[in-house]
Amino acid sequence: MFTRDMNIATFDPELFEAMSNEVVRQEEHIELIASENYCSPRVLEAQGSQLTNKYAEGYPGKRYYGGCEYVDIAEQLAIDRAKELFGATYANVQPHAGSQANAAVFQALVTPGGKVLGMSLAHGGHLTHGSHVSFSGKSYEAFQYGLHPETGDIDYEELERLAVEHKPEMIIGGFSAFSGVVDWARMRTIADKVGAYFFVDMAHVAGLIAAGLYPNPVPHAHVVTTTTHKTLAGPRGGLIISGCDDEAIYKKLNSAVFPGGQGGPLMHIIAAKAVAFKEALSPEFKVYQQNVLANALAMVDVLQDRGYKVVSNGTQNHLLLLDLIDKDITGKDADAALGKAHITVNKNSVPNDPRSPFVTSGLRLGTPAITRRGFGIEETKALTGWICDILDDIENEDVSKRVQDQVKELCARFPVYQK
């Protein structure tokens, strides 16, 4: 028998302390990891709901368990809103994560051991786009394209040359650390030239796309995936959508998710996705995404004024990649120094990085989370100046302590969740 006043604090104080400390960390530290964001209390409410108790293998109206009449409604709302948000004719909201959504696409469209062509992890791609440490590089023959050394843009000529040479079954667009705008139409043309499927992982820019501020890949790709957190600011999860109007592909995708890769869906997370999609359809969400872009540009301006190199010479989305090779600072050391001052970033490889992925020569910075808590251009410029102060004198304890105090004061002015 349960009562509503049961709680973690009295039952498991050790765990509750860790959870409480994480709440404090999120409130008192500045979050600049480009893939992290804060979801709304409405999304949190759905994630903590009793829908977590319901098993619902299958799809709405076609379940293997009874008692699914209400979770069917929740999942159908999520499906319909996802399609509306991105102009798609198909949506599968069941993937537990972006990587599992990507795995389902591979399973649906590529023969075991088949050839794929994706963006190099070292140039800003993702593990699941053909990296040798991922299923995408272990179970498939993966080839990699990258950035042009002079322009910092995707090297489409190299991409086309590799596509013609290797004849991949699938070409993958999308990235985890690229600050430019992708020419989806050109990539589809290359895919058509070699008879390949064109698959886009838009996880990092899905929120910008939903707001109409970044080119939508749905009209060009056979299949598109995304996470539902990051710029979408929803729960941690995955999504597959398409506008190709090919029912055979849709059927393959559904089968690849269930039963091919997953069993029962997480109905509480699917409900949270439905909430997040409704939030993303609002006018306020577009304003938020506009501010994300404005803050990213402000960050670039300060970094370049202070003599720091930004990969691709700027940004056209929510993130930027800081190249520290000329400063002779490792990404690992920069990450640690900023973390000590309560500024959370992540070390990241840069193009032609001489250091290992465990050390790196760069930092990836993103503005979705700081914008979500209300930082504007003024606050972003001040913050970026503090970052430069630390990197200018990375072992200076006085600078670190001063910035930590400034961070604490700024965070107090802009709480993540106001009381």
UniProtKB/Swiss-Prot annotation:
Gene Ontology cellular-component terms listed: cytosol
Residues the record lists as binding (6S)-5,6,7,8-tetrahydrofolate = 121, 125-127, 356-358
Pathway per the UniProt entry: One-carbon metabolism; tetrahydrofolate interconversion; Amino-acid biosynthesis; glycine biosynthesis; glycine from L-serine: step 1/1
Record-linked NCBIfam families: PRK00011.1
Instruction: List the Pfam families hit by this protein, alphabetically.
Output: SHMT
Which HAMAP family does this one have? SHMT
Originating species: Colwellia psychrerythraea (strain 34H / ATCC BAA-681) (Vibrio psychroerythus)
What does the record give as the reaction this protein catalyses? Answer: (6R)-5,10-methylene-5,6,7,8-tetrahydrofolate + glycine + H2O = (6S)-5,6,7,8-tetrahydrofolate + L-serine
Task: Kindly list the residues the record flags as site (Plays an important role in substrate specificity).
Answer: 229
Coiled-coil region(s): none
* Its biological purpose: Catalyzes the reversible interconversion of serine and glycine with tetrahydrofolate (THF) serving as the one-carbon carrier. This reaction serves as the major source of one-carbon groups required for the biosynthesis of purines, thymidylate, methionine, and other important biomolecules. Also exhibits THF-independent aldolase activity toward beta-hydroxyamino acids, producing glycine and aldehydes, via a retro-aldol mechanism.
By which gene is this protein encoded?
A: glyA1
Its subunit composition reads: Homodimer.
Q: Does the keyword NADP apply?
A: no
Whether Transferase counts among this entry's keywords is: yes
Q: What is its EC number?
A: 2.1.2.1
Q: Name one GO biological process term.
A: glycine biosynthetic process from serine
**Which PROSITE patterns has this protein been placed in?**
SHMT
Obligatory cofactor(s): pyridoxal 5'-phosphate
* Keywords annotated in UniProt: Amino-acid biosynthesis, Cytoplasm, One-carbon metabolism, Pyridoxal phosphate, Transferase
- Which SUPFAM superfamilies does the entry mention? PLP-dependent transferases (SSF53383)
Q: Into which family does the record put it?
A: Belongs to the SHMT family.
Q: What is this protein called?
A: Serine hydroxymethyltransferase 1
Q: Which InterPro entries match?
A: PyrdxlP-dep_Trfase, PyrdxlP-dep_Trfase_major, PyrdxlP-dep_Trfase_small, Ser_HO-MeTrfase, Ser_HO-MeTrfase-like, Ser_HO-MeTrfase_PLP_BS, SHMT-like_dom
Cell location: Cytoplasm
